């Protein structure tokens, strides 16, 4: 038993550590600034009144923070079987008169008491010293390694993980029941990333030299320039050294002829070549156990196993079928607390949302659409409404707005037409019958739609169309979702088909220009509110530019193109402050002009175009984006170069000749060529192929 130092506590000294009253029994050992004692505590811990007291005199605040890390680590690992249990702690300032040692510092010193579980059977190193002749058997080694690996795995499963950094034989204790426990967390840290600059590299090197044991250091701790972090794989390396020493009572890289630390570090860095197993009689172990040592002592930390993988291999060697739980007790309690709090919050939110939903989603007492009887107009067309108590049918996996029931099977709306098929079919039947109905039901849906359509027809100045035609147009607009641009003028079905064909080909209207001008005037008279200037189409403006003479030619400029760049800052502010929503002026509707080659008056226009070379503009206003300034005298416009004459054999017949050849009858405005006409044209254009 070592002799106590002069400043050590004597037996019977009474102290208070946290909430425990302590009485010193005897002095055990010392290390660094720490003294270790056995003591009695009140109240007892886990039925035992004997505990271990660690007294540390800290010379600076920086070392005080390191000691606090040890206390916090033991507190987080409290309640685990293979780690020395934390009981209580206390810290206080220390005066110069109470300092330990011979050196008195002018800095403020601190005194820290750490109360821990007492292990009666001392440490593992003491147990191995009793077995110097009869060394540990492989079964005993596997059992010790199994328990220590569980303690290391628990450190690595904390949140955040805890790196011990000083795993060795001397830091394993044995309690009264023969359980091996990991202790001394004074060197433990969290994950340490690789250094980023020379200053960080030097600080990390000094820290490792102070808080680690040279024989147990990993290669990444010696050569920091490799850029590997200090993480759990460094503890795995130390476990490999620990296992080797259990087997051979020495570390694998110690040599009798080593005289310096640099030689030891050089041997560790070349571990792939210097690792050897000194098998002797009485210390011959299985290849599986040697392989476990080899994988832990790999130079590349990325190729080493983690604590759980190593524990699984040791458990398999021990004969265990399952791996024990290595999640620390504190983490389990933290998860339970979070789950309980989350469940409580969800319950409160659920109750609050239930109350709000109950207030918001309260159903109205009356249905606003209950008074609409759709059977009145559906029965007229032969349709029967399906009963409300019909059998439930399978609905396709689509949104409710994407399908409908036709009475038999669910069907999907087509993307091109959004109307319901029942309305479409009804419209088709009504159009096929060609009969008009009188709806006297004031609450019917079609009566409401008909009244809305009549209002629109009155605004568009109906010119003689029948009620039947207006009703058809209204139903067509409902079923297709489109808009009918032209008013019905009472023409026959044949003329309507011809007009629709012309409108498809030309993209215009089925009225001539005169009639369109009259309709435009009617629209202007019926809509006196719109006062916006008439907007000319692109074709109309191009025609005006072509028809203008030299006197009316407008000077070309770039005005209007810089409207976003030539403005001042005040204009920018006004533009930004300008409200985005504005009332849209009502546009004046006018059908586009019919092309000359499809118009009934194209012969007259061609004759007039052949006699006149210039096209004067009739009372046309200049364009809004072009300046109305006379051209300068200095600018002389050059006439375009003469166009070369086309050879006779490449000339194609004119549009007039083609129209005359393709016309089949005088009554039809649009006619298609037959096969004989096409053959004649082909023989004329390509005589060599006939």
Curated annotation (Swiss-Prot):
- Region: Disordered, residue numbers: 478-537, 579-690
Q: Which SMART domains match?
A: S_TKc (SM00220)
Q: Can you tell which superkingdom this protein's organism belongs to?
A: Eukaryota
Where along the chain is composition biased (Polar residues)? 480-494
Q: Could you tell me the EC number(s) of this protein?
A: 2.7.11.1
Listed under GO cellular component are: actin cortical patch; cytoplasm
Where composition is biased (Basic and acidic residues), the residues are: 515-524, 657-666
List the PROSITE patterns.
PROTEIN_KINASE_DOM (PS50011), PROTEIN_KINASE_ST (PS00108)
Asked if the Swiss-Prot or TrEMBL record annotates the protein with the keyword Lyase, the reply is no
- The UniProt regions of compositional bias labelled Low complexity, in chain numbering, are 599-614
Q: Give me any GO biological process, just one.
A: filamentous growth of a unicellular organism
Q: Which reaction does it catalyse?
A: L-seryl-[protein] + ATP = O-phospho-L-seryl-[protein] + ADP + H(+); L-threonyl-[protein] + ATP = O-phospho-L-threonyl-[protein] + ADP + H(+)
A GO molecular-function term, please? protein serine kinase activity
Q: Which InterPro entries match?
A: Kinase-like_dom_sf (IPR011009), Prot_kinase_dom (IPR000719), Ser/Thr_kinase_AS (IPR008271)
Instruction: Report domain Protein kinase positions.
Output: 22-317
Give, as one word, the top-level EC class: transferase
Q: Which Gene3D superfamilies match?
A: Transferase(Phosphotransferase) domain 1
Q: What happens when the gene is disrupted?
A: Leads to increased caspofungin sensitivity.
This protein is called: Actin-regulating kinase PRK1
> Per the UniProt entry, what species is this protein from, by scientific name?
Candida albicans (strain SC5314 / ATCC MYA-2876)
């Amino acid at each position: 038993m070592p002799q106590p130092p002069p400043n050590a506590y004597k037996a019977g000294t009474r102290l208070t550590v946290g909430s425990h009253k302590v009485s010193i029994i005897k002095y055990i050992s010392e290390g660094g600034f720490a003294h270790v004692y056995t003591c009695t505590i009140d109240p007892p811990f886990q039925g035992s009144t004997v505990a271990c007291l660690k007294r540390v005199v800290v010379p600076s605040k920086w070392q005080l923070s390191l000691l606090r890390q040890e206390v916090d680590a033991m507190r987080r690992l409290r309640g685990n079987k293979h780690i020395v249990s934390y009981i209580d702690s206390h810290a206080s300032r220390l005066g110069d008169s109470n300092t330990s040692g011979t050196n008195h510092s002018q800095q403020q010193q601190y005194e820290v008491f750490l109360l821990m579980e007492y292990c009666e059977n001392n440490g593992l190193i003491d147990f191995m010293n009793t077995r110097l002749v009869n060394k540990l058997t492989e079964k005993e080694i596997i059992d010790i390694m199994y328990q220590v690996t569980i303690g290391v795995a628990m450190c690595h499963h904390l949140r955040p993980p805890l790196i011990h950094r000083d795993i060795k034989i001397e830091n394993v204790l044995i309690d009264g029941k023969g359980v091996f426990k990991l202790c001394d967390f004074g060197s433990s840290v969290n994950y340490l990333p690789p250094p980023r600059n020379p200053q960080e590299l030097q600080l990390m090197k000094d820290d490792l030299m102070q808080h680690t044991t040279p024989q147990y250091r990993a290669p990444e701790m010696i050569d920091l320039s490799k850029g590997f972090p200090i993480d759990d794989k460094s503890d795995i390396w130390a476990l490999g050294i620990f296992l080797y020493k259990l087997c051979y009572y020495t570390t694998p890289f110690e040599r009798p002829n080593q005289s310096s630390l640099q030689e030891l570090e050089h041997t560790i860095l070349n571990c792939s070549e210097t690792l050897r197993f000194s098998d002797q009689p009485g210390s011959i172990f299985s290849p599986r156990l040697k392989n476990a040592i080899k994988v832990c002592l790999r130079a590349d930390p990325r190729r080493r196993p983690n604590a759980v993988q190593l524990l699984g291999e040791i458990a398999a060697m021990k004969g265990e079928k399952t791996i024990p739980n290595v999640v620390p007790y504190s983490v389990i309690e933290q998860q339970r607390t979070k789950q309980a709090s989350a469940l409580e919050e969800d319950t409160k939110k659920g109750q609050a949302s239930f109350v709000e939903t109950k207030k918001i989603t309260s159903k109205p007492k009356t249905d606003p659409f209950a008074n609409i009887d759709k059977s009145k107009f559906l029965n007229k067309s032969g349709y029967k409404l399906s009963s409300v108590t019909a059998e439930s049918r399978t609905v396709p996996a689509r949104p409710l707005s994407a399908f409908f029931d036709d009475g038999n099977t669910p069907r999907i709306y087509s993307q091109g037409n959004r109307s319901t098929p029942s309305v479409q079919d009804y419209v088709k039947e009504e159009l096929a019958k060609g009969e008009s109905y009188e709806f006297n039901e004031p609450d019917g849906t079609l009566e409401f739609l008909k009244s809305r359509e009549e209002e629109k027809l009155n605004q568009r100045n109906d010119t003689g169309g029948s009620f039947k035609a207006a009703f058809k147009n209204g139903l067509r607009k409902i079923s297709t979702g489109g808009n009918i641009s032209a008013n019905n003028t009472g023409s026959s079905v044949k003329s309507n088909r011809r007009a629709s064909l012309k409108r498809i080909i030309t993209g215009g209207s089925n009225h001539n220009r005169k009639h369109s001008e009259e309709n435009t005037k009617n629209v202007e008279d019926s809509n006196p509110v719109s006062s916006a200037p008439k907007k000319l189409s692109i074709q109309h403006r191009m025609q005006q530019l072509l028809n203008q003479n030299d006197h009316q030619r407008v000077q070309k400029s770039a005005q209007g193109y810089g409207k976003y760049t030539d403005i001042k800052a005040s204009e920018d502010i006004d533009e930004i402050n300008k409200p985005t929503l504005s009332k849209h002026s009502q546009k004046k509707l006018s059908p586009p002009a019919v092309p000359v080659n499809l118009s009934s008056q194209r012969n007259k226009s061609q004759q007039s175009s052949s006699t006149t070379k210039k096209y004067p503009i009739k009372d046309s206003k200049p364009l809004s984006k072009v300046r109305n300034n006379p051209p300068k005298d200095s600018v002389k416009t050059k006439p375009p170069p003469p166009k070369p004459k086309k050879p006779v054999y490449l000339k194609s017949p004119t549009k007039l000749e083609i129209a005359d050849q393709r016309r089949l009858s005088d009554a039809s405005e649009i006619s298609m060529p037959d096969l004989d006409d096409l053959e004649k044209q082909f023989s004329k254009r390509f005589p060599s192929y006939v």
